[in-house]
């Protein structure tokens, strides 16, 4: 069942209580992106996640950590035999299955989720007036079946919502999905810096209200505002990002991003996300 985020009123600029609301403990949020226009999937086929990221807010150290999870990551999905790709978890069991699969992979508790389709992404970027970004190379891709043409030039660009969506979804180069994950990280940091530099945090609830048709979450209004306030107070210099370490693996005839327990722990250690240690797991 689709659950839209709670309707929120735009808080008046004089409402210091709302503006001062902050998190008092770490929370981990699983961010999932769904592409309803993905031509890789049949119209009646369950949707797979097009992007997955763990956002960890630590009010103790005033830091935010973002860990990108390649959609082809080789995982075991609860209740299924053998190996699957991480992006299949949502198709098999919805948000709860995706949360459990990521929690098992990382040995990290997932407190909340935010599921966004690309329409919401485009709307948010347009609402903040677009994002300035240095595009690392020319990008061109054409998919007539999806009525999609990506044509972004190398150099400094001002990306509106549509072109920003094309930038973060482009994967037709030598790095494939891994290159796309790297671009998503780069773009998110640039967009976050712009969003949370908006003069007043009271615009954040308005963003949620505007895109609520395209967003599903189990966070309540106050928690969303606290997370937004914390992000604004931390500043983009306190945002650390990384990608799940691993390597390409096609030994079984399927292209996976294979990772090990050691690589998972290294990924989390480098950006400061705590996880369950192996000895703690054994004691239980």
Q: Which residues are covered by each model-predicted region?
A:
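Non-catalytic, solvent-exposed segments at the cell envelope interface
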Residues: 1-284
